[in-house]
């Protein structure tokens, strides 16, 4: 909300862009907007206070929060408020409108990224060095004149400009991260990027050089730091069970082979 209010949105206009609370993960992975909203003013205030309290509690336990990173996401009505910005339409996702995206190689991207991070700092303080951003999560429209290499370079550069110790958290999901995205992170990749291998148990990617439509230069995401993850109850599979024998084998094997 604070971010959008820097660009001629009223409080209510910015607030009403938010999806309902159950859908925030998908909104901030650039999949949808508005759906399930609007939320009340009271809810926004309560959510902010609760988040700040959670941050303090987690810090006391030595737990790092993964904050939101910025890869150019904007509302689909952004041109009504900022007509001079070059906007990339991102199409739809599951019958819903995806948020638009500004060009990361455009003249205004660095300014927008800095504004976003300052707005987030106002909300939560300087609480973490970990940031999540996933350009083209489950779709989106890649313009022919803007490569994943350029996007990765610009997103990481703007993040490190704000926080020199930042670590960009990227989900390994479907065909992401692409080879070009990883290569675009350049020399910073070793110290400032971490890949979450979300389906580490069911369908690991860390030991592959090919997944979906992606062909990598080397396994372990071209030698990038990564985290073995277990994502089981999604996609209509809500049962409380797990593959215990597979877990007992796969986790030690990952330690040995990585």
Regions found by a protein language model. Name each.
Residues 1-258:
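Catalytic-core regions of glycoside hydrolase
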